[in-house]
Protein backbone atom coordinates (compact mmCIF):
# COMPACT_ATOMS: atom_id res chain seq x y z
CA UNK A 1 0.00 0.00 0.00
CA UNK A 2 2.85 2.43 0.76
CA UNK A 3 4.00 2.01 -2.83
CA UNK A 4 1.17 4.43 -3.65
CA UNK A 5 3.13 7.03 -1.68
CA UNK A 6 6.59 6.32 -3.03
CA UNK A 7 5.29 6.36 -6.60
CA UNK A 8 3.19 9.53 -6.24
CA UNK A 9 4.34 12.21 -8.69
CA UNK A 10 2.15 15.14 -7.61
CA UNK A 11 1.86 16.01 -3.92
CA UNK A 12 -0.25 18.57 -2.08
CA UNK A 13 1.32 19.25 1.33
CA UNK A 14 -0.79 21.01 3.97
CA UNK A 15 0.83 22.40 7.12
CA UNK A 16 -1.34 23.53 10.03
CA UNK A 17 -1.23 26.65 12.20
CA UNK A 18 -0.03 24.97 15.39
CA UNK A 19 3.01 23.57 13.58
CA UNK A 20 3.86 26.76 11.70
CA UNK A 21 3.62 29.04 14.71
CA UNK A 22 5.10 26.78 17.41
CA UNK A 23 1.70 26.70 19.13
CA UNK A 24 1.19 30.46 18.86
CA UNK A 25 4.69 31.78 19.54
CA UNK A 26 5.13 33.33 16.09
CA UNK A 27 6.31 31.78 12.84
CA UNK A 28 8.74 28.93 13.49
CA UNK A 29 11.35 29.77 10.85
CA UNK A 30 13.55 26.84 11.86
CA UNK A 31 10.77 24.29 11.36
CA UNK A 32 9.76 25.94 8.09
CA UNK A 33 13.34 25.64 6.89
CA UNK A 34 13.40 21.92 7.69
CA UNK A 35 10.19 21.28 5.75
CA UNK A 36 11.43 23.40 2.83
CA UNK A 37 14.65 21.39 2.69
CA UNK A 38 12.62 18.19 2.40
CA UNK A 39 10.22 19.65 -0.17
CA UNK A 40 13.17 20.79 -2.28
CA UNK A 41 14.57 17.25 -2.12
CA UNK A 42 11.21 15.94 -3.35
CA UNK A 43 11.25 18.55 -6.11
CA UNK A 44 14.72 17.45 -7.17
CA UNK A 45 13.46 13.85 -7.29
CA UNK A 46 10.82 14.89 -9.83
CA UNK A 47 7.84 15.29 -7.50
CA UNK A 48 5.49 18.16 -8.39
CA UNK A 49 4.52 20.12 -5.29
CA UNK A 50 1.72 22.40 -4.12
CA UNK A 51 1.88 23.78 -0.58
CA UNK A 52 -1.26 24.71 1.38
CA UNK A 53 -0.14 26.82 4.30
CA UNK A 54 -2.22 27.81 7.30
CA UNK A 55 -0.86 30.24 9.83
CA UNK A 56 -1.85 33.73 8.64
CA UNK A 57 -4.26 34.41 11.51
CA UNK A 58 -1.96 32.82 14.09
CA UNK A 59 1.07 34.74 12.79
CA UNK A 60 -0.91 37.98 12.86
CA UNK A 61 -2.07 37.30 16.41
CA UNK A 62 1.54 36.84 17.46
CA UNK A 63 2.60 40.12 15.83
CA UNK A 64 -0.27 41.92 17.55
CA UNK A 65 0.47 40.33 20.91
CA UNK A 66 -2.92 38.61 21.11
CA UNK A 67 -2.95 35.41 23.16
CA UNK A 68 -6.51 34.28 22.41
CA UNK A 69 -8.05 33.76 18.98
CA UNK A 70 -10.67 36.52 18.49
CA UNK A 71 -14.25 35.61 17.66
CA UNK A 72 -15.14 38.81 15.80
CA UNK A 73 -14.79 38.42 12.03
CA UNK A 74 -13.20 41.85 11.48
CA UNK A 75 -10.51 41.12 14.08
CA UNK A 76 -9.76 37.73 12.53
CA UNK A 77 -9.48 39.35 9.12
CA UNK A 78 -7.18 42.05 10.44
CA UNK A 79 -4.93 39.41 12.00
CA UNK A 80 -4.94 37.46 8.73
CA UNK A 81 -3.96 40.54 6.72
CA UNK A 82 -1.03 41.23 9.02
CA UNK A 83 0.05 37.61 9.30
CA UNK A 84 -0.21 36.76 5.61
CA UNK A 85 2.56 39.25 4.81
CA UNK A 86 5.04 37.57 7.12
CA UNK A 87 3.88 34.08 6.19
CA UNK A 88 4.42 34.39 2.45
CA UNK A 89 7.71 36.26 2.92
CA UNK A 90 8.98 33.47 5.16
CA UNK A 91 8.14 30.78 2.62
CA UNK A 92 9.57 32.80 -0.26
CA UNK A 93 12.90 33.48 1.44
CA UNK A 94 13.26 29.90 2.66
CA UNK A 95 12.63 28.38 -0.77
CA UNK A 96 14.83 31.03 -2.43
CA UNK A 97 17.79 29.79 -0.37
CA UNK A 98 17.51 26.59 -2.40
CA UNK A 99 16.97 28.33 -5.74
CA UNK A 100 13.23 27.67 -5.87
CA UNK A 101 10.54 30.16 -6.90
CA UNK A 102 7.19 30.33 -5.10
CA UNK A 103 3.84 31.87 -6.03
CA UNK A 104 1.15 33.11 -3.64
CA UNK A 105 -2.45 32.11 -4.35
CA UNK A 106 -5.34 33.15 -2.08
CA UNK A 107 -8.68 31.43 -2.67
CA UNK A 108 -12.26 31.67 -1.44
CA UNK A 109 -15.05 29.13 -1.81
CA UNK A 110 -16.64 31.36 -4.45
CA UNK A 111 -13.52 30.96 -6.60
CA UNK A 112 -14.04 27.20 -6.79
CA UNK A 113 -17.86 27.21 -6.81
CA UNK A 114 -17.95 29.24 -10.03
CA UNK A 115 -17.12 26.91 -12.91
CA UNK A 116 -15.25 29.53 -14.97
CA UNK A 117 -13.13 30.71 -12.04
CA UNK A 118 -12.50 27.09 -11.06
CA UNK A 119 -11.11 26.33 -14.52
CA UNK A 120 -9.00 29.50 -14.44
CA UNK A 121 -7.55 28.53 -11.06
CA UNK A 122 -6.81 25.03 -12.34
CA UNK A 123 -5.05 26.38 -15.44
CA UNK A 124 -2.94 28.78 -13.36
CA UNK A 125 -1.90 26.08 -10.91
CA UNK A 126 -1.02 23.67 -13.68
CA UNK A 127 1.06 26.34 -15.41
CA UNK A 128 2.96 27.07 -12.19
CA UNK A 129 3.63 23.38 -11.58
CA UNK A 130 4.89 22.94 -15.15
CA UNK A 131 7.21 25.93 -14.61
CA UNK A 132 8.56 24.12 -11.53
CA UNK A 133 7.30 26.91 -9.29
CA UNK A 134 5.90 25.91 -5.89
CA UNK A 135 2.43 27.47 -5.34
CA UNK A 136 1.78 28.50 -1.73
CA UNK A 137 -1.99 28.52 -1.17
CA UNK A 138 -4.09 29.85 1.67
CA UNK A 139 -7.71 30.85 2.15
CA UNK A 140 -8.25 34.56 1.53
CA UNK A 141 -9.24 35.23 5.13
CA UNK A 142 -9.18 39.01 4.71
CA UNK A 143 -12.25 39.08 2.44
CA UNK A 144 -14.05 35.82 3.12
CA UNK A 145 -17.31 35.68 5.10
CA UNK A 146 -18.86 32.82 7.05
CA UNK A 147 -21.15 32.08 4.12
CA UNK A 148 -18.31 31.60 1.61
CA UNK A 149 -15.46 30.24 3.69
CA UNK A 150 -14.03 26.73 3.31
CA UNK A 151 -14.12 26.39 7.09
CA UNK A 152 -10.60 25.02 7.46
CA UNK A 153 -7.48 24.52 5.39
CA UNK A 154 -7.83 20.73 5.46
CA UNK A 155 -10.89 21.15 3.24
CA UNK A 156 -9.08 23.69 1.09
CA UNK A 157 -6.14 21.30 0.67
CA UNK A 158 -8.48 18.51 -0.45
CA UNK A 159 -10.14 20.79 -2.99
CA UNK A 160 -6.71 21.82 -4.27
CA UNK A 161 -5.78 18.13 -4.57
CA UNK A 162 -8.89 17.69 -6.73
CA UNK A 163 -8.06 20.84 -8.67
CA UNK A 164 -4.55 19.74 -9.66
CA UNK A 165 -5.41 16.00 -9.79
CA UNK A 166 -2.78 15.20 -7.16
CA UNK A 167 -1.74 11.64 -6.44
CA UNK A 168 -1.15 12.32 -2.76
CA UNK A 169 -2.42 14.73 -0.10
CA UNK A 170 -0.12 15.00 2.93
CA UNK A 171 -1.65 16.66 5.99
CA UNK A 172 1.04 17.57 8.52
CA UNK A 173 -0.46 17.94 11.96
CA UNK A 174 0.49 18.01 15.65
CA UNK A 175 -0.60 14.36 16.04
CA UNK A 176 1.22 11.31 14.68
CA UNK A 177 -1.89 10.26 12.74
CA UNK A 178 -5.34 8.86 13.47
CA UNK A 179 -5.68 6.61 16.51
CA UNK A 180 -8.36 4.09 17.49
CA UNK A 181 -8.88 6.14 20.68
CA UNK A 182 -7.82 9.57 21.90
CA UNK A 183 -4.12 9.17 22.84
CA UNK A 184 -4.36 12.18 25.14
CA UNK A 185 -6.78 10.26 27.36
CA UNK A 186 -6.02 6.62 26.59
CA UNK A 187 -2.41 5.35 26.87
CA UNK A 188 -3.40 2.16 25.03
CA UNK A 189 -4.53 4.01 21.90
CA UNK A 190 -3.11 2.46 18.73
CA UNK A 191 -2.14 4.29 15.56
CA UNK A 192 -4.26 3.37 12.53
CA UNK A 193 -1.64 2.83 9.84
CA UNK A 194 -3.91 2.21 6.87
CA UNK A 195 -7.64 2.34 6.12
CA UNK A 196 -10.13 3.12 3.39
CA UNK A 197 -11.08 6.78 3.43
CA UNK A 198 -14.79 5.91 3.31
CA UNK A 199 -14.66 3.39 6.19
CA UNK A 200 -17.57 4.45 8.47
CA UNK A 201 -15.71 3.07 11.51
CA UNK A 202 -13.31 6.01 11.26
CA UNK A 203 -16.05 8.50 12.17
CA UNK A 204 -16.20 7.16 15.71
CA UNK A 205 -12.47 7.69 16.32
CA UNK A 206 -12.15 11.06 14.57
CA UNK A 207 -14.25 13.05 17.02
CA UNK A 208 -13.03 16.21 18.69
CA UNK A 209 -12.22 19.72 17.58
CA UNK A 210 -9.11 21.54 16.51
CA UNK A 211 -6.77 23.46 18.76
CA UNK A 212 -7.17 27.06 19.84
CA UNK A 213 -5.20 28.41 16.90
CA UNK A 214 -6.72 26.44 14.05
CA UNK A 215 -10.22 25.47 12.92
CA UNK A 216 -9.61 21.86 11.92
CA UNK A 217 -9.69 18.78 14.14
CA UNK A 218 -9.27 15.13 13.13
CA UNK A 219 -12.85 15.03 11.84
CA UNK A 220 -12.05 17.73 9.28
CA UNK A 221 -8.96 15.79 8.21
CA UNK A 222 -11.05 12.67 7.65
CA UNK A 223 -13.56 14.71 5.68
CA UNK A 224 -10.70 16.14 3.62
CA UNK A 225 -9.36 12.65 2.89
CA UNK A 226 -12.79 11.58 1.66
CA UNK A 227 -13.03 14.64 -0.55
CA UNK A 228 -9.54 14.06 -1.97
CA UNK A 229 -10.47 10.45 -2.65
CA UNK A 230 -13.09 11.71 -5.13
CA UNK A 231 -10.22 12.51 -7.52
CA UNK A 232 -8.37 9.27 -6.75
CA UNK A 233 -5.86 10.85 -4.33
CA UNK A 234 -4.45 9.02 -1.32
CA UNK A 235 -4.17 10.99 1.93
CA UNK A 236 -1.61 10.70 4.70
CA UNK A 237 -2.27 12.29 8.09
CA UNK A 238 1.06 12.42 9.89
CA UNK A 239 2.95 14.27 12.60
CA UNK A 240 4.70 17.29 11.18
CA UNK A 241 7.26 17.30 13.99
CA UNK A 242 8.51 13.80 13.18
CA UNK A 243 12.15 13.86 12.11
CA UNK A 244 12.54 14.07 8.30
CA UNK A 245 8.86 13.26 7.93
CA UNK A 246 8.54 13.98 4.18
CA UNK A 247 11.76 12.14 3.35
CA UNK A 248 10.52 9.11 5.27
CA UNK A 249 7.15 9.16 3.52
CA UNK A 250 8.86 9.27 0.14
CA UNK A 251 11.03 6.31 1.18
CA UNK A 252 7.89 4.30 1.96
CA UNK A 253 8.28 4.21 5.74
CA UNK A 254 5.12 3.20 7.58
CA UNK A 255 4.43 6.39 9.51
CA UNK A 256 1.18 8.28 9.89
CA UNK A 257 -2.24 7.13 8.70
CA UNK A 258 -2.71 6.34 5.01
CA UNK A 259 -6.32 6.73 3.82
CA UNK A 260 -6.96 5.28 0.39
CA UNK A 261 -9.74 5.90 -2.13
CA UNK A 262 -12.24 3.08 -2.58
CA UNK A 263 -13.66 4.18 -5.93
CA UNK A 264 -11.97 5.23 -9.14
CA UNK A 265 -11.31 8.84 -10.04
CA UNK A 266 -14.34 10.97 -10.87
CA UNK A 267 -14.58 12.76 -14.19
CA UNK A 268 -13.26 16.33 -14.13
CA UNK A 269 -16.69 17.99 -13.99
CA UNK A 270 -17.82 15.76 -11.15
CA UNK A 271 -14.64 16.55 -9.22
CA UNK A 272 -15.73 20.17 -9.42
CA UNK A 273 -19.22 19.23 -8.25
CA UNK A 274 -17.72 17.30 -5.33
CA UNK A 275 -16.07 20.53 -4.22
CA UNK A 276 -19.41 22.37 -4.07
CA UNK A 277 -19.62 22.19 -0.29
CA UNK A 278 -22.31 24.84 0.08
CA UNK A 279 -25.85 23.77 -0.68
CA UNK A 280 -28.90 26.00 -1.03
CA UNK A 281 -31.79 23.57 -0.61
CA UNK A 282 -32.98 20.00 -0.23
CA UNK A 283 -35.05 17.67 -2.41
CA UNK A 284 -36.81 14.82 -0.58
CA UNK A 285 -37.10 11.84 -2.94
CA UNK A 286 -39.48 8.91 -3.04
CA UNK A 287 -38.12 5.36 -2.81
CA UNK A 288 -38.29 4.88 -6.57
CA UNK A 289 -36.05 7.88 -7.20
CA UNK A 290 -33.65 6.77 -4.46
CA UNK A 291 -33.36 3.36 -6.11
CA UNK A 292 -32.87 4.88 -9.57
CA UNK A 293 -30.16 7.32 -8.47
CA UNK A 294 -28.35 4.67 -6.43
CA UNK A 295 -27.88 2.59 -9.58
CA UNK A 296 -25.79 5.41 -11.04
CA UNK A 297 -25.87 7.37 -14.31
CA UNK A 298 -29.51 8.42 -13.81
CA UNK A 299 -31.04 11.89 -13.84
CA UNK A 300 -33.50 13.06 -11.19
CA UNK A 301 -36.95 13.66 -12.67
CA UNK A 302 -39.64 15.83 -11.02
CA UNK A 303 -41.94 12.83 -10.65
CA UNK A 304 -39.55 11.26 -8.11
CA UNK A 305 -39.47 14.25 -5.74
CA UNK A 306 -41.89 14.50 -2.81
CA UNK A 307 -40.83 17.75 -1.17
CA UNK A 308 -38.73 20.88 -1.78
CA UNK A 309 -36.97 22.58 1.14
CA UNK A 310 -35.08 25.87 1.19
CA UNK A 311 -34.76 28.63 -1.35
CA UNK A 312 -32.48 28.09 -4.33
CA UNK A 313 -32.09 29.46 -7.82
CA UNK A 314 -31.56 27.58 -11.04
CA UNK A 315 -27.98 26.29 -11.22
CA UNK A 316 -27.42 26.20 -7.45
CA UNK A 317 -26.43 23.10 -5.51
CA UNK A 318 -29.13 21.04 -3.78
CA UNK A 319 -29.01 17.96 -1.57
CA UNK A 320 -31.08 14.91 -2.53
CA UNK A 321 -32.24 12.88 0.47
CA UNK A 322 -34.20 9.67 1.00
CA UNK A 323 -37.53 9.73 2.88
CA UNK A 324 -35.63 8.85 6.09
CA UNK A 325 -33.28 11.84 5.66
CA UNK A 326 -30.23 9.94 4.37
CA UNK A 327 -28.22 12.00 1.88
CA UNK A 328 -28.15 10.22 -1.48
CA UNK A 329 -26.69 12.74 -3.89
CA UNK A 330 -25.96 16.38 -4.63
CA UNK A 331 -26.52 18.22 -7.86
CA UNK A 332 -27.22 21.46 -9.69
CA UNK A 333 -30.92 22.24 -9.97
CA UNK A 334 -32.41 22.98 -13.40
CA UNK A 335 -35.27 24.88 -11.75
CA UNK A 336 -35.57 27.34 -8.88
CA UNK A 337 -37.19 26.27 -5.61
CA UNK A 338 -40.43 28.08 -6.54
CA UNK A 339 -40.56 26.35 -9.92
CA UNK A 340 -39.65 22.98 -8.41
CA UNK A 341 -42.48 23.27 -5.86
CA UNK A 342 -44.95 23.41 -8.76
CA UNK A 343 -43.62 20.48 -10.82
CA UNK A 344 -42.61 17.87 -8.24
CA UNK A 345 -44.58 14.65 -8.48
CA UNK A 346 -45.39 15.42 -12.12
CA UNK A 347 -44.16 13.57 -15.22
CA UNK A 348 -41.74 15.60 -17.33
CA UNK A 349 -44.22 16.02 -20.18
CA UNK A 350 -46.50 17.93 -17.77
CA UNK A 351 -43.92 20.66 -17.02
CA UNK A 352 -45.00 22.94 -19.88
CA UNK A 353 -48.62 22.71 -18.80
CA UNK A 354 -47.71 23.66 -15.22
CA UNK A 355 -45.10 26.37 -15.81
CA UNK A 356 -45.91 27.44 -19.35
CA UNK A 357 -42.39 26.49 -20.45
CA UNK A 358 -39.82 23.73 -19.92
CA UNK A 359 -36.14 24.54 -19.27
CA UNK A 360 -35.17 20.86 -19.01
CA UNK A 361 -37.09 17.59 -18.59
CA UNK A 362 -34.94 16.72 -15.56
CA UNK A 363 -34.92 18.46 -12.21
CA UNK A 364 -31.21 17.53 -11.91
CA UNK A 365 -29.36 16.15 -14.95
CA UNK A 366 -27.08 13.17 -14.37
CA UNK A 367 -24.06 15.16 -15.66
CA UNK A 368 -24.64 17.61 -12.82
CA UNK A 369 -25.30 14.96 -10.16
CA UNK A 370 -22.87 13.24 -7.82
CA UNK A 371 -23.64 10.33 -5.49
CA UNK A 372 -22.41 10.65 -1.90
UniProtKB/Swiss-Prot annotation:
Keyword Phosphoprotein: no
Main location: cytoplasm
Residues given in the record as substrate binding sites: 54, 141, 153
The protein's enzyme class: transferase
Family as reported in the entry's similarity comment: Belongs to the glutamate 5-kinase family.
Xref: PANTHER family: GLUTAMATE 5-KINASE, ISOPENTENYL PHOSPHATE KINASE
Protein name, per record: Glutamate 5-kinase
Organism: Pseudomonas fluorescens (strain ATCC BAA-477 / NRRL B-23932 / Pf-5)
Lineage: Bacteria, Pseudomonadati, Pseudomonadota, Gammaproteobacteria, Pseudomonadales
Gene: proB
Amino acid sequence: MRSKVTGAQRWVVKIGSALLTADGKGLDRTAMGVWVEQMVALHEAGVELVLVSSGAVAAGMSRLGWTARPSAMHELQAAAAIGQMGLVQAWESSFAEHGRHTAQILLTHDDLSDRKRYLNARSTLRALVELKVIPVINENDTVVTDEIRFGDNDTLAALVANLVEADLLVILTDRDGMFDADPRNNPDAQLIYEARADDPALDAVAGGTGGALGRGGMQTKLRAARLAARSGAHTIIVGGRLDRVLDRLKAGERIGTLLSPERGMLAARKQWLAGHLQTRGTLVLDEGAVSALSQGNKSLLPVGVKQVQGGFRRGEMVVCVAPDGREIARGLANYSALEAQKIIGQPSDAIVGVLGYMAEPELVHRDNLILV
